[in-house]
From Swiss-Prot:
Residues that bind ATP: I195, S196, E197, R198, I199, S200, T201, K202
Membrane topology field: Multi-pass membrane protein
Function (record text): High affinity carnitine transporter involved in the active cellular uptake of carnitine. Also transports organic cations.
GO molecular function, one term: transmembrane transporter activity
Induction (record text): During drought, cold and salt stress treatments.
Protein name listed in UniProt: Organic cation/carnitine transporter 5
Any one GO CC term of the record: plant-type vacuole membrane
One Pfam family in the UniProt entry: Sugar_tr
Subcellular compartments: Vacuole membrane
Organism annotation: Arabidopsis thaliana
Family from the record: Belongs to the major facilitator (TC 2.A.1) superfamily. Organic cation transporter (TC 2.A.1.19) family.
Record PROSITE patterns: MFS (PS50850)
Gene: OCT5
InterPro entries: MFS_dom, MFS_sugar_transport-like, MFS_trans_sf
Entry keyword annotation includes Nucleotide-binding: yes
Length: 515
């Protein structure tokens, strides 16, 4: 307890000795948000709910684009166990329940189409996410602000999801999936950055787990919603997820607070202090007393402006973002690929997806423990090695017909992939300053999506060699996770706002380590 209070003591004394000197915004934020209040929690939940609806759009095709079950009508030429329905007359068989609109496959008559056409909606969704990641990353961090970007992203995603109800063929549906992918490509980025910039260093590991938990709850709720509407049209599932998402985006617009760090960086000190007052009403008096000691706007405007291109021009930034993207590519393959490949283990699809979602919940308890007890690098490295080994062993157990053990190992691999993503998301926030943090986080999620885009093709390998895709995902997670050894350690460090501050602190840390 004494150690946690020690850093505040000299700062307080220094402020008392010279109350006329400028005070850094980082010190003001850290002190005013040193306690975690109920208003902070409500703001985190409000923003974090965007990830709930985002996760539903990511995994919704598991149910809407599934191959429906069918039965024979003419048993003289049809056998459910051996017959290929593409080689017998349409009158000899029918979909279970006699309902053609249960799935995209049945409604658009894709049962005998190529695998490319059947997987086109999922593929265009990921392509849209990749294109959106590139295009939206070009928007400067200082243009609209964290809150406005999150609102536009969530609202566009929900509006397009509702429009899918009007799609009449696979091409229109695939185009709308592309638009959804484009719109939601940076939803997680905007939400994570907005939350992390409104919290102190002390509470960051725990607070940033809230939106991730809500992401998983979205995944879990999707399984429940899909089960409840399993006898209705697949389009109903889009309405059940998109309409609440649209309502939530309106709540974001009216009730979510902007990032105080971003406001300060834009020279809007008055607005930044007002946000801090609303987040932490108990420290209103302290904030009013120190607001006049912040650097004025004209001083802030003298600092250099940065954009995403600087992540590739500045040597240390390029090195970090490259390493992060390599690690996230491997984690993305496992995180998105394992739920797709689980059908090769021959378990109930509703049960398997629900269990995969439930397995994620403990990760939000484990992740803060790892962040508080161990270094960032070692946590990422060991987690990736364990997760990769689980994936490879899952493949081996499947070859020997040990279905239950293989499924348990699949859950273990998915568990580690989720922890890895949690760790890297917080790690990246600490690796880059406020002026490029949005852009850097976009690159992280871009690598995650590119890894996910490879999954449908890799998962299809399991149809020829049972569960081979698990071995591929396992080797990717372990092998690419080794690059964590090349990243600098950031445990216990506060966030920087400019590139200059980041460089000065990194240099100071190098000097202290060499002494």
């Amino acid at each position: 307890m004494a150690d946690s209070l020690a850093p505040l003591l000299p700062t307080h004394i220094e402020e008392d000795e010279d109350t006329s000197s400028p005070l850094t915004f980082d010190k003001i934020l850290e002190k005013s948000l040193s306690d975690f209040g109920f208003s902070q929690f409500l703001q985190i939940v409000l923003v974090g709910l965007a990830l709930t609806f985002d996760s539903q759009q990511i995994f919704i095709t598991v149910f809407t684009d599934a191959y429906p079950t069918w039965h024979c009508l003419d048993h003289t030429i049809c056998n459910p166990a051996t017959t290929d329905i593409c080689k017998i007359p349409r009158s000899a068989w029918d979909w279970d329940g006699g309902f053609k609109g249960k799935s995209v496959i049945s409604e658009f008559d894709l049962e005998c189409s190529s695998s490319f056409l059947r997987s086109l909606p999922s593929s265009t969704f990921y392509v849209g996410s990749i294109v959106g990641g590139v295009v939206l990353a070009m928007i400067p961090d200082g243009s609209l602000g964290r809150k406005q970007l999150l609102f536009f992203s969530s609202f566009a995603m929900s509006l397009t999801g509702i429009s899918i109800f009007l799609s009449s063929n696979i091409w229109i549906y695939s185009f709308l999936k592309f638009v959804i992918g484009f719109a939601r490509s940076q939803t997680g980025t905007y939400a994570l950055v907005l939350i992390s910039e409104r919290i102190s260093t002390k509470w960051r590991p725990r607070a940033t787990m809230v939106p991730f938990t809500l992401f998983v709850l979205g995944f879990m709720s999707l399984s429940g919603i899909a089960y409840l509407v399993r006898h209705a049209s697949w389009k109903v599932l889009y309405l059940c997820t998109s309409i609440p998402a649209g309502i939530h985006s309106i709540f974001i617009y009216f009730f979510a607070l902007e990032s105080p760090r971003w406001l300060h960086l834009e020279g809007k000190n008055k607005e930044a202090i007002e946000v801090l007052k609303r987040i932490s009403p108990a420290n209103r008096g302290y904030l009013e007393s120190v607001s006049s000691r912040l650097r004025p706007k004209e001083t802030l405007e003298q600092t250099s402006s940065y954009s995403i291109k600087d992540l590739f021009i500045i040597k240390w930034a390029f090195r970090r973002v490259t390493l992060v993207m390599i690690i996230m590519f491997g984690l993305g393959m496992s995180y998105y690929g394992v739920p797709l490949a689980v059908r090769d283990i021959k378990v109930n699809i509703y049960m398997s997806e629900a269990l995969n979602a439930m397995v994620e919940l403990p990760t939000f308890v484990v992740t803060p423990i790892l962040l508080e007890q161990f270094s960032r690098r070692s946590s990422v490295l060991v987690n990736c090695l364990i997760g990769g080994a689980s994936g490879v062993l899952c493949f081996v157990m499947s070859l020997y017909g040990r279905t239950k053990i293989a499924f348990a190992l699949e859950l273990g691999s998915f568990f580690c992939a989720r922890i890895g993503f949690n760790l890297m998301a917080i790690y990246l926030v600490e690796l880059f300053p406020t002026c490029v943090r949005n852009s850097a986080t976009m690159m992280l999620r871009q690598a995650l999506v590119v890894g996910g885009a490879c999954c449908p093709l890799i998962a299809s390998l399991g149809r020829n060699v049972p569960s081979l895709s698990f071995a591929v995902f396992g080797f990717a997670m372990s092998g690419l996770g080794l690059f964590a050894l090349l990243l600098p350690e950031t445990k216990g460090l506060s966030l920087c706002d400019t590139m200059e501050e980041q460089e000065q602190r990194d240099q100071a840390l190098k000097t202290s380590h060499s002494c």
